[in-house]
C-alpha cells in the first residue's frame, strides 16, 4: 500500500517525524519503508525553523538568522529576501552538496561571511533539485507551519511515501485513517479527522426490500445525485490520487477512490439511467448468471453470489466491481451513489470463484469498519457538492441496520504470564489495552475487553496478548527463556534426526496436490478440489513422495530411501480434520556394499523400520497389535495396520504394483505412514533407565498349538505374556505351518517360552510346573483370543 507522508500527517494532531512513523509501523507489525531515495549528500538537508533575524552589520542585503534544526540552534548568514522569523525552511548542514545559481555543485562548509560565522545554508527548492516547486521571486523555500523539524527536507519536497506491506490480519490499516489511528495509539500524538472528512449528517429515509440479503449486507445506503456533468477532478485531488498510487479518471470516480483510500470505505457510483426505479439493494443470484464488469470482461456468477441489483437487473458483484452497463460515463448527469457493509465471507467466497482482485475486494474481504460506512458516504457527497454546486442531493435511502454488539473477550494475567512471561495485574493490563481503542473493565482475576468493530483480527484471548506484546518495550519483556518447542515439535525433531542419521533423506512436498499427482493414489479422497482449480489438499503423504521418488529415479538415483513429516487433511462426518503424519518410503533394491549382495525390499523391510521408529519414539511395540488391512494403495497380501486397542496408528507394507506402474517406478516400493498425533499420545513419559544384565541362566520350552487360520499368531503370544507369571521372561513365535495334516481352516503355530529368575537358578521341576500352568490357562482362553480386538 502506497502511503504519502503529507497526506498521512493530516490525520495527526501534531506532526510525527518519518523515523517515528516507521518505528510505529514496526510495532504494529507492518513492513514499511520510505520509497524515495536520495544521495547521502542530501540527507544532511533538514527542516529548520528560523527563530530570529537581524541585519548583517557589514552587508546591506544579508541577514543573520538563528535557525533551530531540530537538535541545536545555529547561526546562518542568509541573503534571501523572504528570510524572517517563524518560517520553516530547508537547512543544508555542513557536508551537504547543493547546486548554486550557476548550476554548479557546491559543498556546504563552516565559513565566515563578511566577518560573521555561518554554520549552514537556508536553501531554495531549485537548489535541492525541485525547481518546479519554486514560486515567485528567488528565495528560500517555506514549508507549512506544522512541518516537523529535523526531517529530511528532500523527502518532504518530493512528497515522501511509505511502501507498506499489510498482512491479512491488518485490514483495518488499509486506509490513511486506519493506519494513522494505529500509529497514533503507539506514538506521542492523537488522531484527528481532516476538515474535508468532517461533515454534519444528511437527511435519511429508511425503507425495506424483500429481496435484500440482510445477513450478507446488514446495512445498505444509496443516494441519488443529479445535476452532474463529465469533468476532470481538481489538480490537487489528482495529485493526491497519484501519490496514493491511483490513476485519476474523472471527478466522480476520483472522489469515490479518494474516500476509499483515505477512510477505508469502498463506494460505487451507478448511472441512474441504468437503475430501474432508482432503487438499489444487495441480493444473491438464484442461478448462474453472465455479467460484464467494468473491466470489459464477462464472468459467470455462480448461484448464491452476492450482487448489487435493482428490481430486475444485476448491476455489479457486491464488494468487487460494478457492471459495465451501469458505469458512470460522459453522458451521465445523474448517479446513484452506493455505500454498504458487506460481510467479509460473503464477498471472499465468490470473489475467489471468479478470480477477480480489486481495491474494494481487498478491503471487504479483510473486513471494514461498519461504523465508517455513513461518514464515508457523507464525505463523498460533500466533495461532489463542492465540485458541482448546482448538484441536487436526494435524501439517503437506507436498508437495514447494523446492530451487532462489539465482541467481548476476557484476558487473564496467567495467560499473559504463560505466553509472554509478563506479570501484570488486571488494572495494568487494562491500562495497556485502553489506549489501543479497546473498552476495558478490570475485574478481580481478568479484564473484560470490548473489541472495536473495525478490529476483525481480534477473535480470542491470544489476540489480546499479541496487542499487549506489541505495546510493551523490549526492555520490559521477559529475560526468561521460554520453551522453544512443543511436545509434537520435539517428537518431530527427534524422529527426523533419527531417520536422517539412519541414512534416509527428508522430502518436503506441497500440501496442495494438482490433479496429476493426486491421481497417483488409488484411494478415493473425501476432499474436493479448490474452486476453479485442480488443486486439492492431500489426505496422505504418499502421492507427493511417490512423485518425488519417481523424479529421483528418472535422474538415475540408484535408490530412494526417504521420509517426510507433514500435515494431511480428511473429512469425517462433515468435520474437517488436520493431522501430522510421518511416512517412510523405500524403493529399488538395496546393495550391501560389504558383500555386494542385492537384498530385495519386502514387507519385513518396512516392518523393521516401523519397529525402529516406534522404539526411538519411546513407544513399545508390545503396546500395538498388527492386523490385516485392505488399503487400496497397498499389495492386498503384503500390508498391515497397526492398532493400539481400537485406535489406528498407521499402515505399512508393499505398494500395489498398479500404483508403481502409474508412478513409472519399475521396482517394488515399500511404504509406511503413521499418525504423529496418535504416536505422541502413546509416548511414554518415563526416562530411560539402566537394566542390569542377568547373571542367572534362562530355560526355554516350546509349545505347538492349532488355531484358526485367520487368528494372528501374535495375539496368542500376547495372551501368554498377559498371564501373571514371575518367571516368564519372553515368548517368541518359532514357526507358523499350514499344509499337510492341518485342515484348510486351521494353522499350527510353535511358540518358545523363556523362563528366568533374576535371583537364582530355576530347577527343571519349577519350570515344568510353571509351563503346565501357563499352557492350561492358554487352552482355557484360546476360544476367546481375538474377540473384541480391532
From Swiss-Prot:
<feature type="binding site">
    <location>
        <position position="466"/>
    </location>
    <ligand>
        <name>Mg(2+)</name>
    </ligand>
</feature>
<keyword id="KW-0547">Nucleotide-binding</keyword>
<dbReference type="InterPro" id="IPR009061">
    <property type="entry name" value="DNA-bd_dom_put_sf"/>
</dbReference>
<dbReference type="InterPro" id="IPR004532">
    <property type="entry name" value="Phe-tRNA-ligase_IIc_bsu_bact"/>
</dbReference>
<feature type="binding site">
    <location>
        <position position="467"/>
    </location>
    <ligand>
        <name>Mg(2+)</name>
    </ligand>
</feature>
<feature type="binding site">
    <location>
        <position position="463"/>
    </location>
    <ligand>
        <name>Mg(2+)</name>
    </ligand>
</feature>
<dbReference type="InterPro" id="IPR005147">
    <property type="entry name" value="tRNA_synthase_B5-dom"/>
</dbReference>
<dbReference type="Pfam" id="PF03483">
    <property type="entry name" value="B3_4"/>
</dbReference>
<dbReference type="GO" id="GO:0004826">
    <property type="term" value="F:phenylalanine-tRNA ligase activity"/>
</dbReference>
<dbReference type="Pfam" id="PF03484">
    <property type="entry name" value="B5"/>
</dbReference>
<dbReference type="Pfam" id="PF17759">
    <property type="entry name" value="tRNA_synthFbeta"/>
</dbReference>
<keyword id="KW-0436">Ligase</keyword>
<dbReference type="Pfam" id="PF03147">
    <property type="entry name" value="FDX-ACB"/>
</dbReference>
<feature type="domain" description="FDX-ACB">
    <location>
        <begin position="694"/>
        <end position="790"/>
    </location>
</feature>
<keyword id="KW-0648">Protein biosynthesis</keyword>
<keyword id="KW-0479">Metal-binding</keyword>
<dbReference type="Pfam" id="PF01588">
    <property type="entry name" value="tRNA_bind"/>
</dbReference>
<dbReference type="InterPro" id="IPR036690">
    <property type="entry name" value="Fdx_antiC-bd_sf"/>
</dbReference>
<protein>
    <recommendedName>
        <fullName>Phenylalanine--tRNA ligase beta subunit</fullName>
        <ecNumber>6.1.1.20</ecNumber>
    </recommendedName>
</protein>
<dbReference type="InterPro" id="IPR020825">
    <property type="entry name" value="Phe-tRNA_synthase-like_B3/B4"/>
</dbReference>
<keyword id="KW-0963">Cytoplasm</keyword>
<dbReference type="InterPro" id="IPR045864">
    <property type="entry name" value="aa-tRNA-synth_II/BPL/LPL"/>
</dbReference>
<keyword id="KW-0820">tRNA-binding</keyword>
<dbReference type="InterPro" id="IPR005121">
    <property type="entry name" value="Fdx_antiC-bd"/>
</dbReference>
<keyword id="KW-0694">RNA-binding</keyword>
<dbReference type="GO" id="GO:0005524">
    <property type="term" value="F:ATP binding"/>
</dbReference>
<comment type="subunit">
    <text>Tetramer of two alpha and two beta subunits.</text>
</comment>
<dbReference type="InterPro" id="IPR041616">
    <property type="entry name" value="PheRS_beta_core"/>
</dbReference>
<feature type="binding site">
    <location>
        <position position="457"/>
    </location>
    <ligand>
        <name>Mg(2+)</name>
    </ligand>
</feature>
<dbReference type="InterPro" id="IPR033714">
    <property type="entry name" value="tRNA_bind_bactPheRS"/>
</dbReference>
<keyword id="KW-0460">Magnesium</keyword>
<dbReference type="GO" id="GO:0006432">
    <property type="term" value="P:phenylalanyl-tRNA aminoacylation"/>
</dbReference>
<dbReference type="GO" id="GO:0000287">
    <property type="term" value="F:magnesium ion binding"/>
</dbReference>
<dbReference type="GO" id="GO:0009328">
    <property type="term" value="C:phenylalanine-tRNA ligase complex"/>
</dbReference>
<dbReference type="InterPro" id="IPR002547">
    <property type="entry name" value="tRNA-bd_dom"/>
</dbReference>
<feature type="domain" description="B5">
    <location>
        <begin position="404"/>
        <end position="483"/>
    </location>
</feature>
<keyword id="KW-0067">ATP-binding</keyword>
<dbReference type="InterPro" id="IPR012340">
    <property type="entry name" value="NA-bd_OB-fold"/>
</dbReference>
<keyword id="KW-0030">Aminoacyl-tRNA synthetase</keyword>
<dbReference type="InterPro" id="IPR005146">
    <property type="entry name" value="B3/B4_tRNA-bd"/>
</dbReference>
<feature type="domain" description="tRNA-binding">
    <location>
        <begin position="39"/>
        <end position="154"/>
    </location>
</feature>
<dbReference type="GO" id="GO:0000049">
    <property type="term" value="F:tRNA binding"/>
</dbReference>
